[in-house]
Amino acid sequence: MALISNLKDEYDHPTKTDPDTNPKIVADIISSKEPPQPSQDVAEERSRTDWDLKEMHEFLEGDEAKSEEILRLYQSIERDPILQTRPEQFDYTKNEERESVALRINQMSKYLETEPYEKFRRRLQLMTVNDPSLGIRMLVNIGLFLNCIRGNGTQKQYDFWAKTKEAGKVKQLLRLFRYDELGHGFNVAGCEIFATFDEKTDQFIIDTPHIGATKWWIGGAAHSATHTVCYARLIVKDIDYGVKTFVVPLRDSTHNLLPGVAIGDIGPKLGRQGVDNGWIQFTEVRIPRFFMLQRWCKVDRQGNVTLPPLEQLSYISLLEGRVGMATDSYRIGARYTTIALRYAVARRQFSKGDGQPETKLIDYTLHQRRLLPYLALTYLAALGTDKLERQHDQLLKNLDKALATNNKLLLKNTIQSTKSMFVDSGSLKSTLTWLASDLINEARQSCGGHGYSAYNGFGKTYGDWAVQCTWEGDNNVLGMSAGKTIIKTVQQVLNGKQLKDSTLEFLNDAPALSSAKKAVIRIKSHVDDTDRVLKAIAGLISKYAKDLIPVSYQSWDSIGPQRVVLSKFRCHYYLLETFNERLNDRIKAKSPARPHLENIIKLYYVTNVLGPFIDEFLRFGVISPSVAKYITTEYPQKLCAAIRPYVIGLTDSFQQPDNFINSLIGRYDGNVYTNYLTNVTNVNDPTNYKAPYSEALEAMLNRASLEERERFEKSKAVAAKLSQ
């Protein structure tokens, strides 16, 4: 004990000694300063959590059963040696990433065989957040491909491809789905590949007429897929019947390309290098007539074409991807707000002087304003996307039931629900993927230099995420489409129509809202009233849309930007309405979680809706100018200050484990510096201090002088000799 005491005394009161005569004192040899203790800061803030994390997680996920399933799946994925994450995965080359994805597809297919599809779908959704390349490759195969056949094919066609050919188990065949062409993207109706019916042989001839019709961005085409659902123009007896869907084989049983099929890799991308995106050209490729999906449009042996009135339902297969990407926005937001806020508590920067400790990042006003609105957005997105998923699932069940029983009333109501679903999914997909992209970038910047490290996840995720804004419907195109429907809906209501069985029923109040002279939000206390804020958003949508109706008669294109804005309003109304209803239904007034959730919902609509769109609210007289400053400046910071002490508990409520978060500075224990350095040195061997390109560096550093390399031919001595 005496030795420890002496060492402690030297530590606390170091004295100068002669290391040559007395080199035993540690304080004379190494620094004895106290290292930073970020884990203590995180633990202390975690202790402030005064609500039940289980209750909060169930609130976010929708119910106890879903919450339990999510947590069990997190555990299952973390224990699986193929599916679990590792820091070294951030160092993978393109080929290594594709190999990793192939191994994971193989592993995931085994779960597909052994667990209910709904559970597997949830597993795949979670995996997609960490490995988007895996997610899109499997979702294309069992989601888009099978849903396209389910939505466009007959029952016999679905049974054959999904069951007989085992597409539903990712066996025998590996399929892809894409309508993109080199010269056309989201404009499905503009596809130019031909599917010409040959009556003599009872076959369709699939042909790429020119370079612009080359299928492009086809995930899985370059090396993997055996079949594709091809969107092509149906040509029968020289008549163009528009774009239909066809199953076209690409490779034979030995995985070689079939005659007439040309395929190549499109090369590196901004992200998702694990997907072998390719191009496809068809040269008079023949397929049997029954390879055309004929649930709606039918072509018989004699070339007679039947076009049923419900053919618009054939596009319903596109909805699942949009719903999935909206949900991904919630989980990706939860992941990166957790990382950024844990780091903001653990990291200290700059001191106020007088020996005071450095200040936590999260205690800076600006840092709170940068991150806490995104935390609030993530909470609202959790509930909104859960509702959207359930809405989509119910729509598919109703459609199947209506068609199977020939229930015309149910079918009519389902068609009406489908129209709402296109608006809702388009609005949420576009708005939330845009906001999630901003969230990732802002969270990265808030972590300073360490946010730039690949091992903290931001860089790869941003590259992988960016495509969410431009595929499965470019966000601007989706926004314009949803906005157009909203304008038409408001016009119909103003003309006397009442909406039924529609999520847009709140627009039935458009006549009163659009003609209201008095502002909805007039004093500060009104900003605290969520129901009033909902009325304000509905009022803005009504007035905004009514104002655009006369212009729409002249040109829809000229109001494209305003249509996108309307779709954003629709998204925010949907999120706010859903959160408000569940808060009032599920969380009791005396629940410890309630005041925190009330602050969250207020911060959400103040910083994501009222503030960003204050000009529109003022222009249409929905908000009084006297409260504008309060909304944009004073109230947001008041709410941030109320939420700030509980940021660790609020992010813990997402219940995402370290293996899922996969960020060295975002781990649960908050020990950011030890975690960071330990893992970096484990992945990058510090004994490899000579680079593979060291020879080039050494050649530069050790090169001979310029005079020597010029053989001294320009030296004074040579000049003296030659000048004589």
UniProtKB/Swiss-Prot annotation:
This protein's GO CC annotations: peroxisome
Reactions catalysed according to its record: a 2,3-saturated acyl-CoA + O2 = a (2E)-enoyl-CoA + H2O2
Entry's Gene Ontology BP terms: fatty acid beta-oxidation using acyl-CoA oxidase; lipid homeostasis
Feature: compositional bias, Basic and acidic residues: 7-21
Localization (cell): Peroxisome
Cofactor(s) required for function per UniProt: FAD
Any Pfam family matching the protein: ACOX
InterPro entries the UniProt entry points to: ACOX_C_alpha1, Acyl-CoA_ox_N, Acyl-CoA_Oxase/DH_mid-dom, Acyl-CoA_Oxase/DH_mid-dom_sf, Acyl-CoA_oxidase, Acyl-CoA_oxidase_C, AcylCo_DH-like_C, AcylCoA_DH/ox_N_sf
Any one GO molecular-function label of the UniProt entry: FAD binding
Region entry Disordered, spans: 1-23
Lineage top rank: taxon: Eukaryota
Family from the record: Belongs to the acyl-CoA oxidase family.
Protein name, entry field: Acyl-coenzyme A oxidase 2
Organism: Candida maltosa (Yeast)
Gene: POX2
